[in-house]
């Protein structure tokens, strides 16, 4: 089982973040994820707010094996520029970009002059964008007159050698799951790791795949799982932090939080993570260390480390 790690919520300086990613690579992690578009910043903490795309490419350039990814939000990007940026990253670090995208839902975007349309419009926008991006990556001249994406003979050079870059889409609602069925190589399951909730969303994705004649088994399943390696095995000590860092899951009861978090000794956390990956049929679990300081992040990285590659 390949394993990824996420360092989110702008908890680290560039120097610390690069050290953590170097450590993750040395310990055999398959991928590291960092913060995405800068307007995802919330609150008033004084901290480095590093541009997600710049950091992604900088980390790709300084590492050798590990994949690097960060969240792209559809209304932050022009389709052709995003296709070109991703193709450039692929040229710099072949096969190592984790291209993760979703519709976004951050009120802070308006501070940056970004006026997000409704959720339904953002779904349409993402559909148009990924259709255009796929064509550009194939080396085609793309003309499109969509509601949100308008291109007139756009091309990028160089296109990715394989004519494609794998796409991960994060989502849980039916309309986004239809986009997963249409465009995604990986479904980033944007849910707490609770079997009933994941099963319900999985059934909707399977239905959307059948409607398109696609085998849902073709789509890799990934999930970020809140992980805290610590001396206490009592998950209750992490509930407040879990809810603060995952406000979209704020309605979870304490019992559900206990089931949705991986907390305790390294051995306990490894066992729990393996159990969740098996139960939820995950191909690519990601331990979510968002919000942890550098020392606690290193402890978790070492405690959860997969076997080093030969």
Go through each PLM region and give its residues.
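Active-site-adjacent structural elements that line small-molecule/cofactor binding pockets in enzymes
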Residues: 1-310
């Amino acid at each position: 089982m390949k394993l990824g790690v996420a360092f989110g919520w702008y908890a680290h300086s560039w120097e610390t973040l690069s050290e953590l990613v170097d450590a993750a690579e040395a310990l055999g992690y398959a991928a590291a994820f960092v913060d995405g578009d800068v307007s995802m910043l919330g609150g008033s903490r004084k901290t480095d707010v590093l541009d997600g795309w710049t950091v992604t490419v900088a980390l790709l350039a300084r590492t050798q094996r590990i994949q690097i990814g960060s969240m792209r939000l559809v209304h932050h990007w022009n389709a052709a520029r995003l296709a070109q940026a991703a193709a450039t990253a692929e040229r710099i670090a072949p096969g190592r970009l984790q291209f993760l995208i979703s519709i976004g839902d951050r009120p802070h975007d308006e501070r940056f002059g970004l006026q997000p349309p409704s959720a339904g419009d953002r779904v349409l926008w993402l559909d148009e964008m990924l259709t255009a991006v796929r064509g550009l990556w194939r080396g085609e001249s793309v003309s499109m007159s969509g509601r949100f994406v308008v291109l007139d003979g756009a091309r990028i050079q160089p296109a990715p050698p394989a004519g494609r870059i794998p796409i991960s889409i994060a989502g849980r609602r039916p309309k986004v799951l239809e986009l997963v069925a249409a465009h995604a190589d990986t479904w980033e399951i944007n849910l707490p790791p609770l079997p009933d909730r994941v099963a319900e969303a999985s059934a909707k994705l399977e239905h959307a795949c059948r409607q398109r004649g696609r085998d849902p088994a073709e789509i890799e399943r990934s999930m970020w799982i809140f992980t805290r390696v610590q001396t206490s095995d009592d998950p209750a000590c992490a509930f407040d932090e879990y809810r603060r860092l995952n406000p979209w899951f704020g309605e979870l009861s304490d019992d559900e939080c206990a089931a949705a978090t991986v907390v305790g000794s390294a051995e306990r956390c490894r066992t729990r993570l393996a159990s969740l990956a098996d139960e939820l049929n995950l191909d690519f679990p990601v331990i979510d260390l968002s919000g942890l300081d550098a020392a606690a992040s290193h402890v978790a990285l070492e405690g959860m480390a997969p076997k080093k590659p030969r």
